[in-house]
């Protein structure tokens, strides 16, 4: 029997005297649990601990800027430990059109590539369509990856 767990906690607050503005901080741990059986051997998943924060900053009547950052630490079973840092921003117009960008710094000597992302999204009546593209160097196997998602919020 196997059970891999993720755990996290998020703390959110409003910014006084700034309607709609707020900030949040959180911590998250993933891949917690025993080794998993793969073919004929058992392997441990690399655990990850992340701490991060975000600020939602509305400006004018129809615009919002969200800024995010996080710091991650990978704990591999083979004693390869790696630190990574990510930061991003999202601009929203009327909460219907979003433009996004971000950067992830990872130590390529420890198997964690650095890359930038750019994306956009549209939302109407709870339906959202999002698109993103990863820009990375040749050392990153996931370079030039595209993501498309369609969802519904209720």
Model regions and ranges:
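Outer-membrane beta-barrel porins/channels
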Residues: 1, 5-154
């Amino acid at each position: 029997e196997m059970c891999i767990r993720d755990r996290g906690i998020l703390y959110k607050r409003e910014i006084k005297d700034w309607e709609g503005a707020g900030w949040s901080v959180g911590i998250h741990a993933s891949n917690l649990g025993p080794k998993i059986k793969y073919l004929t051997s058992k392997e441990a998943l690399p655990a990850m601990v992340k701490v991060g924060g975000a600020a939602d900053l509305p400006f004018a009547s129809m615009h919002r800027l969200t800024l995010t950052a996080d710091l991650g630490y990978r704990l591999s079973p083979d004693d390869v430990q790696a630190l990574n840092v990510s930061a991003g921003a999202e601009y929203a117009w009327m909460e219907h059109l979003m433009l996004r960008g971000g950067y992830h710094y990872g130590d390529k000597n420890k198997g964690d590539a650095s890359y930038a992302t750019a994306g956009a999204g549209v939302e109407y009546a709870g339906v959202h369509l999002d698109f993103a593209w990863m820009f990375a160097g040749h050392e990153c196997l996931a370079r030039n990856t595209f993501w498309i998602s369609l969802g519904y919020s209720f």
